[in-house]
């Protein structure tokens, strides 16, 4: 049976400042930790990325032509405050005013994120969000943006608090490149959630127009053997690390007893302790019912198996299928069922996981108001032929995920939009330029844009709301 989506559904495309803009030192932009980290550790940099800094009129014109009526954009904090605090950079402010004006001219609603992995270097090298002083600097930056950019109707505090902490302190593929420190993972997640809560409260108390929420990456976790209690426990613990800890903070304003039991077990096995203060929970509690929306980024699910050995994580950054490894002491290891498809980067393709995650939020956090799927898409080694890409695999991936969103809406979930990652090809943090996601192919040598087959398919779905 052909499935449909509501008439007012947003069909969006997603971007991020550092992954798309380029111009990393242009017009007074301050450095971010990624600048040097990429130079020192990877075979690519974020220059020029997709040159969105200069070519946003082209991308927004394409968006309008192809039925994309929403765009996720992030403000580069260091374009506004080059050192994260202090003096404002007027050229950065002017750039974003111009960008938002172009969005509205093209009838593409901007959903604007304040922090998308790019803390200014001056604050990052001073502990990033492990340093509580940086909570204050973030809230001050947020307040400046709320006042300055009154043309923005949809604000997001953070993009993917979970993967920030994981990338920085667990997997170690984000600066500062620390591995296997679970206490730092939880502490950074907690401090960012406090930052989020304070910004949301400030937004509501200030009477600013528009809506505000947060974007969480929520990969669904399943036991490898649902009949094995140890596998069930492994999935629960993995879910706490990646999903439940931050969801509790968002919508409960505290961590449930079950969540804290899991956190305490993980820290008992792996070492470290947390600094959770009474005033933190006052802030979390004050914001728990103020979130206008939740953004869910969903790409994959994982199956977890009980495991007694030492922690070892190998990140597949080059698309060499089967090269990844993930096992955490006292938690479990990832082991996929043989019949579940994977991408070249070992990301498991499982649309049902998105449905299950949406319905889990609806069931466990009934004070949620609405959901946007703020990222979903397929990373591919696109083959550029005849000035396009025949990306049937991507079309199939997006179609199946849109279908389960339709199912979730039919089953009572309030899902209001979908943003494909990514609008155009961008640079990928730990995979470079080979891993492409865009509706529009970017020739990174010439910066020309070419609509892929998926763009024409997406246009038809956006215009008809019929998924076929």
Curated annotation (Swiss-Prot):
Catalyzed reactions per annotation: a 6-phospho-beta-D-galactoside + H2O = D-galactose 6-phosphate + an alcohol
GO terms for MF: 6-phospho-beta-galactosidase activity; beta-glucosidase activity
UniProt keywords, alphabetically: Glycosidase, Hydrolase
Entry EC no(s): 3.2.1.85
Protein name (record): 6-phospho-beta-galactosidase
Broadest EC class assigned to this enzyme: hydrolase
SUPFAM superfamilies with a match to the protein in the record: (Trans)glycosidases
Family matches, as NCBIfam families: lacG, PRK13511.1
Catalytic machinery residues: 160 (proton donor), 375 (nucleophile)
This protein's pathway: Carbohydrate metabolism; lactose degradation; D-galactose 6-phosphate and beta-D-glucose from lactose 6-phosphate: step 1/1
Gene3D superfamilies xref list: Glycosidases
Lineage start: Bacteria, Bacillati, Bacillota, Bacilli, Lactobacillales
InterPro entries to which the protein is assigned, alphabetical: 6P-beta-galactosidase, Glyco_hydro_1, Glyco_hydro_1_AS, Glyco_hydro_1_N_CS, Glycoside_hydrolase_SF
Keyword Hydrolase: yes
Superkingdom field: Bacteria
Similarity annotation: Belongs to the glycosyl hydrolase 1 family.
